[in-house]
């Protein structure tokens, strides 16, 4: 897991998300606390519970983006789920325990990648032997093998086609749940896996070039060197101690005032979430997984519902509240220019593929920010996503005609922006439908 300090985590998030300092700080502290807990001695470590976070803020201000960037930073099993996808236990749909099962799968993937990297050198050696077998046959004399090995290492044989045998990972047949046994997902795939192991594993013949064959062969050879049971044990431990679950759209499962019935995918889901957030044991096909130390970060826009509409017990289990602020004109300007993969940089790169050079002046960027702020205040506040609508509208004509204008340069200034979106932005009725 990551050993970044809170300041480093915040500065990493700053590269992609403008503003929202409070939310970044809360997330950075929570992530650092995971590392701090690991440094404690055994007796105290069990007592330190994660402080779950609730992020509240209008749509399009960076809640989901913070979670996406955090996933890359965490270096720990991390899963982002929408609360709206789940239904109460007993109804058709996914129950919330599936979150932990998916998290374990992610944990296994992480541990396997780490272990593969450790045996990379040995696996590469074995892969080279298999490529030589395919090139000269296993009965060739040592002298022939060595001369081909030299050519292989010099890259002279990279484009030569060879037939190799690689493990067949199955046809991806869907599994099915056994009623009354959640988590015991038995499928055709599992049965074929069982038979495959009994018969020494299934393989398939693939025709490929020497250079491309290495990826499959190295993976194949590394998997032979790995101990699957140890990987599963380590992954379950990693999920129990370092797992992070990001619950998006939590406000959509809050009960509205005056609504009739509990709502299959509303209050019922909240009730099912309670034990998960508090700490329970979930049965997975890799064994039981305790959720006592899994960190939950929930977020929601809370346009219609309020945080107080959530079940009181669930509110109590999300002790850290962070409010994200609506975006100002200056924020929009910075989003367009300062983020690492800003929209302007993206459009410039896209047009450069047609040999068209886009140049945005400072007043054009101001005008774009102005239009976005105006539309957000007069129509509906959708945050930074409004910029995409405005940019698409401004660059619509250029994008369409780009292939015919290759080799030229286009300057986009304030006049150009006003010409393309000014009239729409001014007419509120029109912009309700178009922007």
UniProtKB/Swiss-Prot annotation:
Name used for this protein in its record: ATP-dependent protease ATPase subunit HslU
Function of the molecule: ATPase subunit of a proteasome-like degradation complex; this subunit has chaperone activity. The binding of ATP and its subsequent hydrolysis by HslU are essential for unfolding of protein substrates subsequently hydrolyzed by HslV. HslU recognizes the N-terminal part of its protein substrates and unfolds these before they are guided to HslV for hydrolysis.
Gene Ontology cellular component annotations, sorted alphabetically: HslUV protease complex
GO molecular function: ATP binding; ATP hydrolysis activity; peptidase activity; proteasome-activating activity
PANTHER family hit by this protein: ATP-DEPENDENT CLP PROTEASE ATP-BINDING SUBUNIT CLPX-LIKE, MITOCHONDRIAL-RELATED, ATP-DEPENDENT PROTEASE ATPASE SUBUNIT HSLU
SUPFAM superfamilies the record matches: P-loop containing nucleoside triphosphate hydrolases
Primary subcellular site in the record, as a coarse category: cytoplasm
CDD domains from the UniProt entry: RecA-like_HslU (cd19498)
Subunit structure: A double ring-shaped homohexamer of HslV is capped on each side by a ring-shaped HslU homohexamer. The assembly of the HslU/HslV complex is dependent on binding of ATP.
Origin species: Agrobacterium fabrum (strain C58 / ATCC 33970)
Family note: Belongs to the ClpX chaperone family. HslU subfamily.
A single BP term in Gene Ontology: proteolysis involved in protein catabolic process
Gene3D superfamilies membership: 1.10.8.60, P-loop containing nucleotide triphosphate hydrolases (3.40.50.300)
Record has ATP-binding as a keyword: yes
Keyword entries, A-Z: ATP-binding, Chaperone, Cytoplasm, Nucleotide-binding
Domain of life of the organism encoding this protein: Bacteria
Coiled coil regions, renumbered to chain: none
Residues annotated as binding ATP: 18, 60-65, 248, 313, 385
Subcellular location(s) of the protein: Cytoplasm
Family matches, as InterPro entries: AAA+_ATPase, ATP-dep_Clp_protease_ClpX, ATPase_AAA_core, Clp_ATPase_C, HslU, P-loop_NTPase
Protein's UniProt keywords contain ATP-binding: yes
